[in-house]
Regions:
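Intein/HINT protein-splicing elements and their conserved insertion hotspots or analogous self-processing inserts
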Residues: 1-9, 19-24, 69-76, 91-212, ...
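Short coil-to-beta-strand
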Residues: 6-16, 48-55, 135-137, 353-354
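General beta-strand structural signal in soluble alpha/beta enzymes
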Residues: 14-16, 55, 93-95, 116, ...
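Glycine-rich anion/phosphate-binding loops
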Residues: 22-38, 376, 380
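A glycine-rich phosphate/pyrophosphate-binding beta-strand-loop-alpha-helix module
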Residues: 29-101
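Conserved phosphate/anionic-ligand binding catalytic regions in large, soluble enzymes, centered on
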Residues: 40-49, 172-189, 305-310, 403, ...
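N-terminal beta1-alpha1 cap of cysteine-dependent amidohydrolase-like domains
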Residues: 242-400, 404-415, 429-437, 474, ...
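Amide-donor transfer/coupling interface in amidating biosynthetic enzymes
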Residues: 339, 346, 385-388, 420-503
Length: 503
């Protein structure tokens, strides 16, 4: 979705890719043609129009030398891509090539990856995961030629049909099969919400494992007569076909463990027995409110070198009814820093909130996050202004990501004041898996004491996005007990059943 400083837009961009190295080893022409068809079909399955699509190609071939056969491989690929563009009515506007894909006696497979891009409307975007149990599943396929390539005219009509069905809200989810055929498509569609498939009586299992380029699997929002029936989604995380059952949990485990030896997705501790976590509950009976109300509170959002979500933060505050003021900290010279300190002190004096947004202030150097923000707020003038806001004017502070790390390291969390911290104080440290994590997680409200959570109830579960390398909160047992008692544990991670977990 394209951001705008003020207002709302539904314009968004989409990008998809297509390539199959196994086909490329057999026929460079067919591989390139299908790469174009696949990349555009992926856009269509997401809710974009093929008429708005443009292409860019990434080409990578073995060193050509004086071998005519080697020279013929990129030529065949380009001919396949050109025919696809002409016949399907979509043009490439950029690309990059390399003819150095050889090392001693090892050559890369002939490679032409098609990237398709398009602008669209967020109202039409659909995601690929199954949404509901009991939904009808159908397969729409174009006419084929040469046994592998879709007929161009038939595929263009199919693109238009799928686009219309999505715009008319008759599709809950959509997917176009690629390298793994229909089996891969149905399996991946079931992953997100762990839904299975009950195949229609007499469904030919052989269809699951062949190529189906240009086809579409649709989860229908209503029972309409379109396509070839596949079956229906089920709450049971299994495939049921011709009296046999396949456990998808085991398939998922095998799928996710493929790269486990080189890129672990869980720690050794997580693979063992799960650590128990109590379900915390703290319901605030009395709330602190400012002595003097403000119809449109002012929010100061300081931007440090490396901050990267100040626009999103300001937008969220603006939509909630506040008046955000974004101020860029100038650290070019010591004199500029002093000027910024004076300006921020003045801005805090006329604000009701301070919002520290996320990012990588100072490049997360040296040796850790938020050190520049922490140093800035420990300036005596800023410390005094913050104390005046929080302790005398009943103001608020909020920190997200890098900003929350600063609140921890300043002592504002959990002590409510800028203090000198020591080894006994809570901190945020590196994830146990040893690398950055970016995913959707489920959290449960444990306490609604915070003004930011006053309209929630303990036990409410939300799905939120996380993206961090240092997201592990660490504190001593005594400190944790005190935080629990005071209602300062705001949320807990939970599993799919809503049970608190330390995983």
């Amino acid at each position: 979705k394209l951001p705008v400083p003020h207002g709302e837009t539904k314009t968004c961009s989409g990008m998809a890719w297509g390539y199959n190295p196994f086909i490329a080893e057999q026929s460079e022409y067919h591989s390139a043609y299908l790469a174009v068809a696949e990349s555009v079909s992926k856009l269509v399955a997401t809710g974009f129009s093929a008429k708005n699509a443009y292409l860019t190609f990434q080409e990578y071939f073995e060193r050509l030398g004086a071998d005519p056969t080697r020279w013929g491989r990129p030529m065949a690929s380009l001919l396949g891509a050109l025919d696809a563009q002409v016949e399907l009515g979509v043009a490439a506007i950029g690309g990059k090539d390399s003819m150095s894909g050889s090392f001693e006696n090892i050559d890369v497979p002939p490679t032409l990856v098609s990237f398709a891009v398009a602008a669209g409307n967020t109202d039409n975007v659909v995601s690929p995961e199954f949404k509901l149990p009991g939904s009808k599943l159908v397969l729409l396929s174009p006419a084929m030629r040469d046994g592998l390539l879709p007929n161009a005219g038939s595929l263009k009509l199919l693109w238009a049909q799928v686009e219309t069905l999505i715009k008319e809200k008759k599709v809950l989810s959509a997917y176009t099969p690629s390298m793994g055929g229909l089996a891969e498509a149905l399996f991946k569609m079931g992953l997100g919400n762990r839904l299975g498939v009950r195949f229609a009586p007499g469904f030919d299992a052989a269809k699951l494992f062949g190529y189906a380029y240009g086809s579409f699997v649709l989860e229908l929002a209503e029972d309409i007569d379109v396509g070839t029936p596949i079956g229906e989604t089920t709450a049971r995380y299994v495939w049921e076909l011709n009296g046999e059952t396949a456990d998808l949990a085991k398939v998922q485990e095998a799928y996710e463990a493929k790269l486990e030896p080189v890129l672990p997705y869980r720690t050794a501790e997580a693979a063992g027995p799960a650590q128990e976590a109590p379900a915390l509950k703290y319901e605030a009976l009395n709330r602190v409110a400012p002595k003097v109300g403000t119809a449109k509170p002012r929010v100061l959002i300081p931007v440090f070198p490396g901050t990267n979500c100040e626009y999103d933060s300001a937008r969220a505050m603006e939509r909630a009814g506040a008046e955000p003021e974004v101020f860029v900290i100038n650290n070019l010279t010591p004199a500029h820093v002093a000027e910024s300190v004076a300006a921020v002190k003045e801005l805090i004096g006329r604000s009701q909130m301070i919002f520290l947004p996320g990012g990588f202030s100072g490049g997360d150097e040296p040796e850790g996050s938020a050190k520049f923000i922490t140093a800035f707020f420990r300036n005596p003038a800023i410390t005094e202004a913050v104390r005046g806001l929080l302790q005398k004017r009943d103001g608020l502070m909020l920190g997200i990501c890098n900003g929350f790390q600063a609140l921890i390291k300043l002592g504002l969390v959990p002590f409510g004041d800028i203090v000198e911290t020591d080894d006994t104080c809570p901190t945020l440290t590196f994830n146990t898996i040893g690398r950055h994590q970016s995913m959707l997680v489920r959290t449960r409200v444990a306490s609604n004491l915070s003004p930011w959570l006053q309209y929630t109830k303990p036990g409410d579960v939300h799905t939120v996005a996380v993206s961090h390398g240092e997201g592990r909160f660490v504190a001593g047992a005594e400190t944790l007990d005190r935080l629990v008692k005071n209602g300062q544990i705001a949320t807990q991670y939970v599993d799919l059943s809503g049970k608190p977990t330390m995983d």
